[in-house]
Amino acid sequence: MVLNVFLAILVLSIIVIVHEFGHFIIAKANGITVVEFSIGFGPKLIHFRKGETEYCIKALPFGGACTMLGDEFLEMSVIQSEEDNDEELTDEEKEAKKRKLAIENGYDMEKSFASKSVWARIAVIAAGPVFNFLLAFVCAVVIVGSLGYDPCDIDVIKDNSPATEAGLQEGDVITKVNGHKVTFYRDFYFYRAYNADKTLNITFTRDGEKMTTTVTPQHIKQQKYQVGIMMNENCLISSVTKDSPAEKAGLKANDVIKAVNGTAMENSSSVTEAITSSGGSSVTFTVARDGKNVDVTVEPKMVEVESYDTGFVVYGDRVKTSPIGTLKYSVEEVGYSVKTVIQSLGMLFTGKIGFDSLLGPVGTVSTMSEIVEESKADGAFYVFLNLMNLAALISANLGVMNLLPIPALDGGRLVFLIIEALRGKPVKREHEGIVNFIGMILLVILMVVVLFKDIMALF
């Protein structure tokens, strides 16, 4: 378990290092002095100085910073204009101003962030997210090169179903659904998960020929035994319904289902089948939790289930591709991750998914640790590939989140710089400072709430 957590923290740290290194290397390229390059927050554990930069590893491993000379974040506590005199400053603000002046006196201010052109500053701020996307691409190359990609090939067609009426056949490859591009099976799965009742205008290829058809899902109401869990494809429980048999029995989010009644489970479909065919008898789940296998016995409950059946099944098996194909589908992998993050944010704000879906650093480490544990049975290479897959997703996620126009994040700072480029003059520093300060406070509050949720989910 300790090793799993260490690996998870290591991966997150690498993602942060790459982000901050993006800022660092582009700042250096533009002649900007980097005062401090740090990994983590809090007290310094290890630090040394090389040239004009102090390099630090700090106590809390989540996060990092690339602090540049003349960067307004160097003196976040001073939200005063240059015209303010010392009598109007609080003791804390005076101390912050002294620190700022001490730093400025020790360096050449012509190498400060603020002294550079607006386009140089835009490049420096944008570099962090861009490097995250580059890291996601490198991880994707390793994954696709090793395992291939997962096209949306139709594997099974049910008799007398909407799929047969639409003329679909086994082996057809879906490339578009209702105007949404489908490169991977996951594209189709994600769309269907939140649009199950919609008629599907499908573009597909058969023997190299492009074709179109329309599938109207069949609305089915039936009685089924359920326990009240949501799973991903790898049998990892993403959520447990409140007051459900699963919650009462003790199943938890992030448990990984390994077996049901002693039978190993290969995917989420096999788990669902085991539950629905139980006939209401008690079902014993063997789940991986905190590095151990735990048995949890649940009594399924009969509920009326509404579903929309298309009549075809896609397994999403990966297939190998050429070196050129590897590069192509690696770019598509990054695009998929970016698109998924943006769509998930949209669904979060529209209420399609709940706040419980958010994960902070603790929740992310916990989930990564469980996935590492789940992968061990397949060998070290698959542990490595699963970590690479998570790194690609998290790195792309970090890139997108940092580009959002939120004060105190890279995206918020880019907004002010773009305004400066369009106006030909910067926004007043005191105004920008106030906005960034408020944004930072709100961001810290959100982080604390998510952190609290993550910690409570561990118990």
Regions found by a protein language model. Name each.
Residues F137, I143-K176, H180-T183, K221-A259, ...:
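PDZ/PDZ-like domain segments forming the peptide/carboxylate-binding groove
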Residues M1-N4, A8, K116-I125, N132, ...:
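Residue-level signature of transmembrane alpha-helical entry/exit and packing/kink sites
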Residues L3-L101, M401-R423:
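Small-residue-rich helix-interface/hinge motifs
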Residues G64, T90-D159, I445:
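Internal alpha-helical transmembrane segments
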Residues I434-D454:
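Final/C-terminal transmembrane alpha-helix of multipass membrane proteins
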Residues H19, I57, G128, A163, ...:
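Terminal peptide-recognition signature
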Residues D71-V78, K158-P217:
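Juxtamembrane extramembrane loops of integral membrane proteins
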Residues I103-W119, K224-K248, A253-A259, T263-A264, ...:
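Functional transmembrane alpha-helices
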